[in-house]
Amino acid sequence: MLIVLFLTLFCSVVFRTAYCDVAIVAPEPNSVYDLSGTSQAVVKVKWMHTDNTPQEKDFVRYTFTLCSGTNAMIEAMATLQTLSASDLTDNEFNAIIENTVGTDGVYFIQVFAQTAIGYTIHYTNRFKLKGMIGTKAANPSMITIAPEAQTRITTGDVGATIDSKSFTVPYNLQTGVVKYAPMQLQPATKVTAKTWKRKYATSEVTYYYTLRNSVDQHTTVTPGWSYIITADSNYATPAPMPADNGGWYNPRKRLSLTARKVNALRHR
């Protein structure tokens, strides 16, 4: 039972751009939780807020939902809890997951964070639950990337969303306090290039000798993948140790010279 909240909230408001960043510091991602000896488990989720806006006081409600499935086919397994922001202390949440919500498999948590003018939806890293006795099937595959986050912040009757064209502007030509990176691509199966060159021959650096009261950039937004990478366990029988299959050798057989005590030779 895990709630691995990896919650990075980006909030954009018409006529006034605002940014928020919630960093999850506990529990650890890619964990395995065994419920064989108990019917439930309590997992402490801890996060921290930055000084950017909307600030911590701007969030009014959090809803945590246990999910399974692929990024394209997310299935809600159980609603864990809905809490007012005032019910949370020290940016911590003790989540309880019952062993009856589904079968053994891979799960993740949807985090719905609500403000007075909108909401954000984020998803945690995936984790495994063992010892489950439910009948609702959970996805068995540990897909490597969490589902894409969604943001909807409104001002009056006007909604503010991220313009997808922002991701096409070269990074070094962007001047706003929020920059947009291109979608991450996977490497090709073969290297065909014969030569290489620097994409950016030079870069800038500014040294400050006193504390600065403002920043040039608040955050970088990266779009989610438009493709899906699936992964699974390696079901092959473990190979024997090298010594068991003749692959091991004594390193002494590779020596062509005999070791000598140099100090002893010098004293002769």
Swiss-Prot record:
Bridged cysteine pairs (disulfide): none
PTM annotation: O-glycosylated.
Listed GO biological process terms: (1->6)-beta-D-glucan biosynthetic process; cell wall biogenesis; fungal-type cell wall organization
InterPro entries (alphabetical): Kre9/Knh1 (IPR045328), Kre9/Knh1-like_N (IPR018466), Kre9/Knh1_C (IPR008659)
Localization per record: Secreted, Cell wall
Keyword DNA-binding: no
UniProt entry keywords in alphabetical sequence: Cell wall, Cell wall biogenesis/degradation, Glycoprotein, Secreted, Signal
GO CC term (a single one): extracellular region
Free-text function comment from the UniProt entry: Involved in cell wall beta(1->6) glucan synthesis.
Family listed: Belongs to the KRE9/KNH1 family.
Protein name per the record: Cell wall synthesis protein KNH1
Gene source species: Saccharomyces cerevisiae (strain ATCC 204508 / S288c)
